[in-house]
Regions:
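Extended, non-globular alpha-helical segments
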Residues: 432-470
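Proteolytic maturation boundary segments
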Residues: 414-415, 419-443
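HINT superfamily self-processing domains
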Residues: 473-476, 486
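Single conserved hydrophobic/aromatic residue that forms the stacking wall/gate
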Residues: 484-495
Length: 495
């Protein structure tokens, strides 16, 4: 067992793995390696193989850590060499992200942790090095919140409960009289960190871990543990994904979209995932981190000018207001946008399929965090396959195989009668994230959607401020979902 390679490094346009190693590195790890090999800017890191996930369930946490320690320490030194920073250092601390990556895409089903390595010493060092204490403390509070949720189990226990960290944030915003997280000051964020840690101590009886290595092992094992959480099991069952596949874990040097107005994070699609139109599109948020976009907590701005104008028309926002308050990335950072557009085109041509990409802009520099074949509606599936056949990207056999029989059912979904819509009183409008029309009684909790179907045989309309992965069962039992803050980039909508 000692001779088995469990960790594969990547960075600086080199990688030990490649895109054909999905079974071992998972989809995310394989594509991170492949993007390095074709010259795409990717933060350095390493991937722990799917085989270790099986070992985790066979031998337990302590045995897996013991087996992994030498390879992980060596791989971390490689990141340190490429970044000039050191994991656990008090002067130049290296912060990392920890993400899951099964061989089949499971959007939103498993867990991610950002800014790992943060502690009371690291936050001061980051503040000093960047000259941006607000950014440092914002990154620290995000880390405590994510780690508390994913690793320490600080989650709502019932439908009446609220996320304990969000409650603390809302109380702080109310106290300060502000609406958005970005309006909180450095001192506010320091207070949030103190209150978060106090909440962790109260609920778990333990202090929040300060040692970066303890944090890392806790996060890695939590990702392996998330492979068997209820929502992941349900998703695998629905999509015929074997439990034996396991998940890989990718650890990467952090790049920061929350460093200020010249930083951003976003998700994009090389073609329209709803219609299949050959139109680059996506969303971004200035001064934010990746989870802010895919979690659907804040409504992002559009990447392209064309997309931004379409959004403004749908939202009845004037062109003047759009340009002033909701400009596209193409307008705000034209050079970065141009590079992003070139990369998405390169990736689609290389992988010969519509790409779903995640990116971060740190102080004006673009970094790619992920690419994968994008989820799409049934109508988009057919159009993309036929368009790519005509473009010579794929052959006829591939085009036919791209059309999943189960997805073709979407083309038969009910739609609203045009005459009825014309005469109806419209209460509100939003962005469609999936095809078809739906009717049913309104419920406000996922478990109520489950109970409605169970007791009455009728599917309800699930109305939420935003969804979380825990809502998956209720979403599947509902006729439709109406969300207040989510958008088409929300991972939960695409499942």
């Amino acid at each position: 067992m000692a001779d088995v390679k469990r960790v594969y490094t990547f960075g600086n346009k080199e990688a030990e793995g490649n895109g054909k190693m999905r079974e071992l590195l998972g989809g995310k790890g394989a594509n991170l390696a492949e993007m390095n090999l074709i010259g795409i800017p990717v933060p350095p890191g390493f991937t722990i193989t799917t085989e270790v996930c099986s070992e985790y369930y066979a031998h337990g946490k302590d045995a897996v850590i013991q087996m992994l320690r030498p390879e992980v320490e060596k791989a971390m030194k490689n990141i340190e060499k490429l970044t000039g920073m050191k994991f656990g250092d008090k002067e130049m601390p290296l912060l990392v992200s920890v993400r899951s990556g099964a061989r089949a895409s499971m959007p939103g089903m498993m867990d991610t942790i950002l800014n790992l390595g943060m502690n009371d010493q690291a936050v001061e060092a980051v503040a000093k090095r960047t000259g941006n204490p607000r950014f440092a403390w914002d990154s620290y509070r995000r880390f405590v919140q994510m780690y508390g949720d994913v690793v320490l189990g600080m989650k709502p226990e019932s439908k009446e409960d609220h996320d304990p960290f969000e409650v603390i944030i809302e109380e702080q915003k109310h106290k300060r009289g502000v609406k958005n997280d970005t309006d909180l000051t450095t001192d506010d964020l320091k207070e949030l960190v103190r209150n978060f840690k106090a909440a962790v101590k109260k609920q778990t009886g333990e202090d929040f871990p300060a040692c970066p290595w303890d944090q890392l092992w806790g996060a890695v094992c939590a990702v392996f543990g998330s492979w068997m959480n209820d929502r992941a099991i349900l998703y695998r069952k629905l999509n015929n994904i074997p439990a034996e596949w396991g998940t890989a874990v990718s650890v990467q040097a952090m790049v920061f979209g929350n460093m200020g107005e010249n930083s951003a994070t976003g998700v994009a699609f090389s073609r329209d995932a709803a219609t299949g139109e050959n139109l680059f599109n996506g969303e971004y948020l200035i001064n934010a981190q990746g989870e802010d976009v895919v979690a659907g907590i804040r409504t992002p701005q559009q990447i392209t000018i064309e997309g931004s104008k379409r959004w403004a028309v749908a939202q009845k926002v004037s062109e003047e207001e759009r340009k002033a308050k909701f400009p596209s990335l193409e307008e705000v950072m034209p050079e970065v946008y141009k590079e992003l557009d070139e990369i998405q085109h390169h990736l689609e041509q290389y992988f010969k399929d519509m790409q779903d990409i995640e990116f971060t802009i740190q102080d004006g520099k673009l970094w790619m965090l992920q690419c994968r074949n994008g989820k799409r509606t049934g109508a988009a599936m057919v159009k993309i396959a036929m368009d790519m056949l005509r473009e010579g990207l794929i052959d006829e056999k591939t085009a036919v195989l791209r059309c999943e029989p189960a997805k073709l059912d979407e083309l038969l979904h009910p739609v609203f009668d045009k005459k009825a819509i014309a005469s109806a009183q419209v209460i509100t409008k939003g962005l469609p994230a999936s095809p078809g029309a739906a009717t049913g009684p309104v419920v406000f909790f996922a478990e109520d959607a489950e109970k409605t179907l169970e007791k009455t045989g009728q599917r309800a309309i699930l109305v939420r401020i935003e969804t979380s992965p825990e809502d998956l069962k209720g979403m599947l039992d509902a006729a439709g979902c109406l969300l207040y803050t989510s958008d088409a980039a929300d991972d939960r909508i695409s499942v």
